[in-house]
Structures are given as C-alpha cells and as structure tokens.
Amino acid sequence: MNFETVIGLEVHVELKTNSKIFSSAPAHFGAEPNTNTTVVDLGMPGVLPVLNKRAVEFGMKAAMAINCEIAKHTKFDRKNYFYPDNPKAYQISQFDKPIGEHGWIEIEVGGKKKKIGITRLHLEEDAGKNTHTSHGYSLVDINRQGTPLIEIVSEPDIRSAEEAYAYLEKLKSIIQYTGVSDVKMEEGSMRCDANISIRPIGQEEFGVKTELKNLNSFNNVRKGIEYEEKRQAEVLKSGGIIEQETRRFEEATGKTSLMRIKEGSDDYRYFPEPDLVDLFIDDAWKERIRAEIPELPDKRQIRYINDLGLPAYDAMVLTLTKEMSDFFEATLAAGADAKQASNWLMGEVSAYLNAEQKELHETGLTPENLAGMIKLIEAGTISSKIAKKVFRELAQNGGDAEQVVKDKGLVQISDEGALRTIISEILDNNEQSIVDFKNGKDRAVGFLVGQVMKATKGQANPPMVNKLLLEEMNKR
C-alpha cells in the first residue's frame, strides 16, 4: 500500500520589539538569566498586563505580508497549563478571534509552484526557558517569558519534507523583509512544530496526526518529517494504529521519541482574558500599517528578472534574504553591472560567508568596495583571478579595492612588450609544446598559458596572453 503524507506546520516567531508584549521589561536576547523580568512576567498577585501596541502592529504587518485578512474585532484568551517556565500557570494567547486568518504563500519545489494556505496568525506571549542539568534538577530562566510572539498555522497543504523546507524558507524570507523579527532559529526567534499524518493515496479523510517538536533547524524539520513518514507507514503496514501524540525529534539519532499523549484545546480550558479589553482595528489603522510593508521577495524577484534581465534562478537566490538583496541593490547603486554583481554575490561572496560562518555585515565587504572591484575587472586593471585575491582582502580587512590593488602590486600586466618578452622565454624552454600545437594538440596552448600566468603570478592579461602566444608560435 502506498501512502500520501499530509503536513501542517506551526511556526512561532518572536517579534523584534523593545519591550515585552504585556510588560515594560526588555525583550532582548542574550541577557543574564532572570534579569529581563518584572512582576508581571513573574505572575505576582494583583499585577495587570498592559498591551504593547507595537507588538499588535508587527502582528498586523506580518499577517498582511502573508496575505491574511485582518480581523476587525480580536481579543486575547487565557490558555491554562502548569509548567515551571510559566509562572502564571496560564499563557495569554488568542483562541477564537486571531488577528489574521485565511492567508497563503507560494512556494516552488522542483520547478513547480504551489500555494500553501495559512489558517491563522495570532499573537501570544512566549514562555520562559528550562535548562535540564545532569544533576537531577532544572534551571528556569524567565527572561523569555512575555516576549511577544506570532504563531503562524498553515493549512494541511504540505505533502513532503521538501515542500515543508521550501515553505519555511519562504516564510522566513517574507517575515525578515517586513522587519518584525530577526527569524534566527539558533537564537530561538523562529521555532517550528510539525503535524504529520499519512493516508492511503486517493483517500480523502485525514489520518491520525502526530505533533513533532524539538525541530531546531530547517534541516531537522526535513529529517524529522522523513523519519516520521517511514515510522507511521511501518506501523500501519504491520497492522498497528497511529496514536495522536506529541513526539520529540532526537538530533543525535535522527529518530523521534514519545513525549506525551497529545492534548486537545479542551485540556487548556481557554477563556477570554479578563484583564485585557477587546481590540477593534479600523480601516485607517490597517492602511497605515500596510503602507509600512516594504517590497517583498516575490515582487523584488520579478523586478530583477524584468528590469535587470537576471535569470530567474539568480533573482530567486538574491532575494532569499533581505540582507543579500539590499546589498545587491546598493552595489548596483555604486555603479556595478547587475550580472557581474549577481555572479560575485552568488559565487565567491556566498562561498566565503558559508566557509567563515558569517553574515555580510560581519565582513569588511561593502557595496562600494565590491562595486569598485567589479569596475577594475571591467576596466582590465585586474583579472578575474586576481580579483579573487582582492575580494578576500576586502572581505577580511575592508578598505578600497583600487588601493588594495596598488598596495599589493596586483595590477594586471597588459604591456605588450613585457608580455612578449616573457612568452618568448617560455617558448624557448618549451619547444615540444610548439611542436604539439602545430600537430593540432590544443592542450599545448593551455599548458603554455598556464606557464605565463605562473611566471607573472597570475597578473598577465589572459586574452592578451592567448593572442600573443598564438602570434609568437606561428612565427616559429
């Protein structure tokens, strides 16, 4: 029996506000444990929450960016549960009236585009963080408690681990462009749970789902889904049944393990938050927030293709992160050719960032010095090979491209007389290569070009070397 996988994703995104959603405590990552707290975060008796207006506006902006309808009337609710990182024994969330509903984003997998529906986007507060020690006790940090979150719940439209990966990449990109979050999984500002079920191909009814947690990277989301697909298929094929449960992905083994039997909404005993009034959003407020949304990746991608003549693949890669796309645009503004800038950013720059585990702003590279280097290549001042040395110097130490070329003595040798002298000496020492060339062996030319480049430490003008080599060999 063959099965179809059905996946829905729940993504939590921390909003980049200065203070928490219901208190005045700072909402910044990396502070000493239990220092970013107030009596509201600690759940002290008699204290009252005060709603952070900017968090609401960030939620509206994110919802609009993923094509959600914004509620005219929304409210907050208490989600009741006890856990050490939740001092109040309830979480303020949104239950039946979320701030955004009925959205969608478009993904592309294997050259095929597909719309993934968004059920809802709602606001809530984050919980604290438990650290479990090897000594039999746990440590609780309340700093994260009360940090504003949006939870984005997809429709069960995703059919594979690859589609889930593409959805998360696209969602991260869109949220990043809006500026409402850093969406850094390594810092916990973007987290994902996956609801996974399988059903026989052709069956309309959904199978029993399991919720998968502890997915701390996009790759782990993919691996967790792939493992869970196989596990559920093996259970059904052996005559067993799938239990509705919450499972943990174990990164060390690549497997999932049981955490608990899955709760339903009734277990949380939701009821309206009595300490917060309902929220009414008028058209004027919505339009003001909509005007703050910048050009999003899909539109920017189309502009790169239509206006700059870039291939679709280049446009997609360049717009995947806002930092890369903004850097590309600034490089063009500094006078670089679009295709050359694209090639460098997608090639050498991306390879360097991956190898060094850095982001663009953590290097010495700027749009101005990258554009300056590209202009030097176009002017024939340096070769593409030498440009790689210049690039590495700029990336590591910054500075001006032209000055680096002068200081390092990297100007391309284009003096015909000097090159003829070098070529003549190399031909004198490689007479067999001349014979091979005249016998139709083209590899001989490549070998001789290599010898010239070696003699000039890569600074000879390659097209001129080819031209002069042929001329000199034909004279002999």
Swiss-Prot record:
One of its GO terms (biological process) is translation. The keyword Ribosomal protein does not apply. Disulfide bonds: none annotated. It catalyses: L-glutamyl-tRNA(Gln) + L-glutamine + ATP + H2O = L-glutaminyl-tRNA(Gln) + L-glutamate + ADP + phosphate + H(+); L-aspartyl-tRNA(Asn) + L-glutamine + ATP + H2O = L-asparaginyl-tRNA(Asn) + L-glutamate + ADP + phosphate + 2 H(+). PROSITE patterns: GATB. SMART domains: GatB_Yqey. Belongs to the GatB/GatE family. GatB subfamily. Allows the formation of correctly charged Asn-tRNA(Asn) or Gln-tRNA(Gln) through the transamidation of misacylated Asp-tRNA(Asn) or Glu-tRNA(Gln) in organisms which lack either or both of asparaginyl-tRNA or glutaminyl-tRNA synthetases. The reaction takes place in the presence of glutamine and ATP through an activated phospho-Asp-tRNA(Asn) or phospho-Glu-tRNA(Gln). This is Aspartyl/glutamyl-tRNA(Asn/Gln) amidotransferase subunit B.
